[in-house]
Amino acid sequence: MKKKGGKAVRRRLVPSGEATIGPFFPQRYVDAGANDLTQVDDRRAEGEAIEIEGVVRQEDGTPLDNLVVEIWQADANGLYRHPADPRHGEADPRFFGWGRAATSKEGRYAFRTIRPGAPHGRARHVNFMLMFSGLMRILKTTMFFPGEQANESDPVYRAVPKARRALLVAREEVPGRYRFDLKLRGAHETPFFDD
């Protein structure tokens, strides 16, 4: 209500959109270079550099563009630069551990990072988070590396039914380059996790 001359004037309110991220999600939300985790301040991180790439698709196979893909992971020694990691003070100061990329019109994303070490009690992995306009919640998943014996004992990997676990494992296309496609719905939907 608005007051006019001491009287309240009723005005019809226009409801906002249902998109949780908002109808005006930025067209440019990702800085150039935010998808390269291999160095901080021109100092190269420890460990083997790898590439992770993929395509994000809807249920019908349509690629999703302007979707924000974030990743976070441990450094080459399995340590996170985060206060919740009891050994975070020992983490590689040249490895930020977090990156962001936007999908192209073809739904493609790409990251350059370091092959993570295995954090205590876990298999080596990379965490993913997806955000875009119209998505009612942030989607989170985890990518595991192929051929790792520790996958079978990882609590997150084991939380997914056996028949769907392969959807969490990247495919190594050539040494050091991994493909991890993400599908938002349907029979081959990527398993997504709640907090």
Walk through the language-model features, giving the residues of each:
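Beta-strand-dominated extracellular/periplasmic modules and repeats
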Residues: K2-D195
